Amino acid sequence: GDFTIMKLTDKTKDILEWIICIVIAFVLALLVRYYIGTPTIVKMPSMYPTLKQDQRLILNRWCRTIKEMPSRGDIITFEAPTSDSYIFSKDFNPNDVAAKYSNEKTKALDKFIYNVLEVNKASYIKRVIALPGEHLQIKDGKVYINDVELQEDYLQPQITTSTENCPFYDLVVPENCVFVMGDNRPESTDSRRFGCIPLEKIESKVWIRFWPLNLFGKVN
């Protein structure tokens, strides 16, 4: 009868309201994750001892949203360059020192899945060493910016910066790019191998470490 129809209608309405609430919550979560910030886990040892494997971080993505230029010393995450583009020979074009990305998406849905949902997207976490227009040199295990030695207190005392099998060790950083390296230089694949990272490929700045709790605080 009419009562049964009304009951079904009310039930359907409740279900629809729940579905709408879930969809809205999902969209809001995506927006916050993409534009403002998101948690992540350190998976590789390339930033040791500053960041250790399995530590939990909060990434600041607002800097990407407002297209803020990172500062030297900032720890950032960025889309990993195409792996088959890494150069291991010293024969390279000195005027072409930006990292290569060959998996650019053209369709809107593919862009959404890759950039927003981050399906099959690899990211690296490294420290910004040199900025646009700066002359970077690595010699005798040390880093020089515009002929001035860079003081790197975040490195372990015995660590030096090798250029073995690394073509990118004497270059001028292009406009809208940064040169990045891991703090654990012997265990880091970074700009020495794949070149400078375009600003448009930077995803976030490391902001807070929230695990382990005894190390909770801002990351420098």
What are the functions of these language-model segments?
Residues 5-16, 35, 49-220:
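Soluble "head" domains of membrane/secretory-pathway proteins
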Residues 17-35:
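Hydrophobic membrane-insertion alpha-helices, especially the h-region
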Residues 31-45:
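Aromatic-capped interface at the extracytoplasmic side
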